[in-house]
């Protein structure tokens, strides 16, 4: 196995995860709640660790199917391990195991939760919690492929490991470009839902939360009784 290239790609994935936390940080700043530093610290950790992993020298820059499976398997584990940090650092979910459960449930769009009082969490963390549904709905590694420059057969091995179904190599010649097209469609459908919910009278913040969770099919809400709280 090409361990150097596996670590380099995982490093890129961690940096992408740090970028994904930026909207949640902005929400925390807007509402001036106590989760601001939790996101800043987590993003710094992700960037430093990701950069160090990316800087590992690799003589052979090619990898094969088993390397792709390793990247996907370890990638899902790493984004969940680091994605749980804002909950723990902020003190909103003191137990790391509970925070990890919540994050894994988000990224895998399972929808299970250990939270009894969802509304007690600060808005930035609730935003991140639902955003994990949106990211996981398309696939964490597919997002990485969408932002990476074309890498030929290497991206094909990652896509094969990430996506079930027909052989993607027989469907599309350029995996990275196809990932971008998929995300454009995903974002477009999400925007349509945002518009419809706003027309229906839902506040913007709540609209984004429920769009992320329903588009990703995870079902997380910022209300204890989910959409039933709106009585509409």
Task: List where the protein language model places each region.
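Membrane-proximal intracellular helices of multi-pass ion channels
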Residues: 1-232
